[in-house]
Amino acid sequence: MLYCLILLLCLSSTYLPSLSLNQDATILRQAKLGLSDPAQSLSSWSDNNDVTPCKWLGVSCDATSNVVSVDLSSFMLVGPFPSILCHLPSLHSLSLYNNSINGSLSADDFDTCHNLISLDLSENLLVGSIPKSLPFNLPNLKFLEISGNNLSDTIPSSFGEFRKLESLNLAGNFLSGTIPASLGNVTTLKELKLAYNLFSPSQIPSQLGNLTELQVLWLAGCNLVGPIPPSLSRLTSLVNLDLTFNQLTGSIPSWITQLKTVEQIELFNNSFSGELPESMGNMTTLKRFDASMNKLTGKIPDNLNLLNLESLNLFENMLEGPLPESITRSKTLSELKLFNNRLTGVLPSQLGANSPLQYVDLSYNRFSGEIPANVCGEGKLEYLILIDNSFSGEISNNLGKCKSLTRVRLSNNKLSGQIPHGFWGLPRLSLLELSDNSFTGSIPKTIIGAKNLSNLRISKNRFSGSIPNEIGSLNGIIEISGAENDFSGEIPESLVKLKQLSRLDLSKNQLSGEIPRELRGWKNLNELNLANNHLSGEIPKEVGILPVLNYLDLSSNQFSGEIPLELQNLKLNVLNLSYNHLSGKIPPLYANKIYAHDFIGNPGLCVDLDGLCRKITRSKNIGYVWILLTIFLLAGLVFVVGIVMFIAKCRKLRALKSSTLAASKWRSFHKLHFSEHEIADCLDEKNVIGFGSSGKVYKVELRGGEVVAVKKLNKSVKGGDDEYSSDSLNRDVFAAEVETLGTIRHKSIVRLWCCCSSGDCKLLVYEYMPNGSLADVLHGDRKGGVVLGWPERLRIALDAAEGLSYLHHDCVPPIVHRDVKSSNILLDSDYGAKVADFGIAKVGQMSGSKTPEAMSGIAGSCGYIAPEYVYTLRVNEKSDIYSFGVVLLELVTGKQPTDSELGDKDMAKWVCTALDKCGLEPVIDPKLDLKFKEEISKVIHIGLLCTSPLPLNRPSMRKVVIMLQEVSGAVPCSSPNTSKRSKTGGKLSPYYTEDLNSV
C-alpha cells in the first residue's frame, strides 16, 4: 500500500508542470475567444494542447514554465477587459497598452488578480468609473497605468490604501472632482501622473508633500489654483515636476532651487508673478526649465552657467535686462526661447560657441548689436528666429556654413551688408525671412542648393541685380516675397515651373521685359503683385485661367495692348491695372465706376457702353453731337422725374436712415458693385435665411443681379443677467470678424465684402454661398433632395482643411477659429467649401499689439468642443483640429455630433465603439457608395487622429491637408506612421511637439 502511495506521488509530481502548462494555455485561449483580433496578432496562440504557451507571442514564462507575464501592447485587439487572465496563478504583469479595450471596469474583474505587480490598460477605450476596490483586489500592485482612456467620475479616495504602489498614471481621462488628499498616504509612490483631466478648480493638496520618494509629479491641465504649497519642498527626490496649463499664482517658491535631483521643471502657462529665484544656480542637475506664459518680471539670473541646462523657455513674460553672459558657458544648452519679453542689450558674443544650440527664438524683444558669429558653433542650429529687435551689422560667414538650419526669421531689424553666398543655398532651409532690413547685394546662383525652401521673404531691403533662373528649380517653394528692393532684369521663365507657388510679390522693383507666358502651371497661385516696375508687353491672357488667383496688381508698369477678356473668369478681391499704357475696351465685368481707380492712368482705355468706342474721325464726331444732344434732353427729363421720386423715397427711408445709417461708418475690403443704401433697403424679415447666437443673416438680391449675405448683429440687451448679451460682446464679435476676414485672402475662406458700424447697428456683408452650409446639406430637409456623394464630401473636407491650415500656418500672427463646425462651412454653387463665421476667432497676439480678443460664454459649439477646453478654458490651434475631426466624422457618418443615437458618447467615442462592435460598414452613411470604402476608412482614421483626447496626439492642420490630399490622390502617399498613439517621451507636457513661434 505504501509503495502505491509513493508511486502515485511520484507520478503526480511528474505531471504537475504539464497540468499547469495546460491550465495556463486553456486560460489564454479563453481570453483570446473574448477578443476580436483583426490583425491576427494572436495567431500563434494554438489550439494544440502539446504546444507550450511560453512560445506564444506576448507570453513570458518563468523557469518552471508558469506564465508570469502577458504583454499584448499594440496588438489592435478589440473587446472588453479579459478578466479571465487574472486566473493565471503566477501572473505578475499584464499589459494591454494601445488597443481598443472597451466597456467599463468592475470590481469583479480583479477578484483573482492578487498577484499582479504591474497592470497597464493605457491608451484604450475604457469608460465609466474606476473601481474603488482596486487597492484591496490588487494588494501587491506597484505599477498602475490607465491613462488615455475615457474614464469619468472621481479618483476613489480608497486609492490612499495602496501599500506598495510606486507608479500611478491616470492622465488623459475625464476624471472629475478634485485630487484626493488621501493619495498623500501612498508613501511608496515614485510617479504620480494625473494630468489633463476635468477636475474642479482646487489647490494642490498639501498632503502630497508626504510622498518623499516621489520622482515624477505630472499635474498639467488639472485646473489647479492658488500657490504651490510649501509642503512640496519635502519632495527632495523629484526628477520631473510638471504643473503646466493651470491657474497657479504667486511667486515661484525659492525652495524649488533646493531640489538636488530635479532634471525638469515645467511651469508653462500659469499666472506666476515676481522674479525668478536668484539661487537657480543651485540646481546643478536641472536640464529643462520652462516658466513661459506667466507674469514674471525682473532679470534672468546670472548664475545659469552652473546649470547643465538643455532647454530654457521663458517666453511671453515681462522679463527685462540683458541675456546673461554666463549662459554661453553652458555646454548642453540646445533650446533657448525668450520671445515676447522686454529684454535688452547686446547678445553675448560667444552664444552658441560652446553649446549645441538647436532652437533659438529671441523675437519681439529689444536686443541690439550683431548676431553672434558662433551661434551655430557646433553645427546643430535648426531654428534662428530673431524677429522684431534692433540687431545690426552683417550676417556672419559662419552662418553660411550652418547646414543644419531649417528656419531663419530675421525680419524687422537693422541688419545690413551682403548675405553670404552659402547662406542662400543651405540644403535643409525651408523658411528664409529677411524682410524689413537693409541688406544689399544680389541673390546668387547658389540658391539652387536650397532644395527644401518653401518660403522666401526678402521684402523691404536693398537687394539688386537679376532674379536667378535657379529659383525655378526649387519645386517646393510656396511664397516669393521680394517687394521694395532694387531687382532688375526680366522675370525668369523658370518661375512658371513652380507648381506649388501661392504668392509672388515682386512689386516696387526695377524689373523689365514681359510676364512669362506659360503660366498654366501656377494652379495654386493666390496672389500676383508686380506693381511699380518697368514691365512691358501685353498682359498674358493665361493670367485669366489661374484657378485660385484673387489678388492681381500690375499697376505702375508699361503694359500695352488690350486687357484680356479672360480676366473676367477670375474671382478677384484686388485688381489694379492703373498707370500703364493699356488701350481698347475695358472688359464688361469691370465697366463700372467702382473699378475706375483700377484702370486710371491708361489714356487709351475706353468703356464701351453702347457697343461704340471713340473713333477719331470727323463724321463720327458730328454724329456723336446729335446723339449727345438727344441724350442730354432725355437725361434732363429723367432727372426731373428722378428728383420727385427721390424726395418721396427719402421721406420713406428717413426714419430707417436716422436709426441705422445716421452715424454709420462703412468700410469695404473689396471692390463693390453696390452701395450701402441697397443693403439697408433689403433688411426685411422676408429675406432672413438664418439665425445665429450673434444675430440674423439676410439674403440680399441687389439691383445689378448680384446676391450677398448680410449678418446683422443683435442689439444689446439692457438689464438681464446674461453678461454675454451685452453690447461689449457685439463689439467683440464684430471686431473679430472684421479683423480676421478683412485682412486675409484665401479661396477656402468666405469673403467679407464690407462692414458697417453705427451707434446701434452693425452689419457684415459677405459673399453669398448659394448651397448653404454643410450642416444644411448633410442634415437639413432641403428641397431637391441634394445628396452629397463621397467625392464631393472629400473635396469639402480638403477645402475646409486648406482654409484652416491657412489660418494656422500662413497668417501672421496665426488665427484660431474657435468655432469650427459643419454649419460654419459654407458651400458655393459648385459645392466648394469655405470656412465662415469668425465671430469668436482669436488672433495670435504679438508683442506690443493691441489685438482684440473676442470672447464668448463658450468657445465653440456643443459636440465640437475639445475636451481640454473644459479644464483649461483656453483654446489654441489644437482645439480647431479637434473640432475639424468631428466634422470629418460627421461627413463620413452623416450624423450630427448631438444625434440622440450617439447616446452619452461624443462623436469620436461613438465611432470607435461602433467600429469595434460592428466594423466599418455600419458606421458609414448609408447614402454613400461603398466602392469608396477604402478612402472612407482613411478619412475616419484622420478624423480619429484629430479627435484624440490629448492635444499632443492631434496632427497639425498642415499635416491634415497632406493626409487628405493623399486620400484624394492629389499627392503621393508618404507612408506615415499609422500607430494609434505613442507614449509621451522626454518632456511630459504634450504642447511641445510644434514650435509656438514657427509660422
Curated annotation (Swiss-Prot):
- List all topological domains (Extracellular): 15-621
Cell membrane listed as a keyword: yes
- List cofactor names only: Mg(2+); Mn(2+)
The catalytic residues are D819 (proton acceptor)
Which GO MF term does the entry hold, naming one?
A: protein serine kinase activity
Q: Does the keyword DNA repair apply?
A: no
> In the record, which residues are listed under signal peptide?
1-14
Q: What Gene3D superfamilies is this protein classified in?
A: Phosphorylase Kinase, domain 1 (3.30.200.20), Ribonuclease Inhibitor (3.80.10.10), Transferase(Phosphotransferase) domain 1 (1.10.510.10)
The Enzyme Commission number assigned here is 2.7.10.1, 2.7.11.1
Q: Which InterPro entries match?
A: Kinase-like_dom_sf, Leu-rich_rpt, Leu-rich_rpt_typical-subtyp, LRR_dom_sf, LRR_N_plant-typ, Plant_LRR-RLKs, Prot_kinase_dom, Protein_kinase_ATP_BS
From the Swiss-Prot or TrEMBL record, give the protein name: Receptor-like protein kinase 5
Q: Which organism is it from?
A: Arabidopsis thaliana
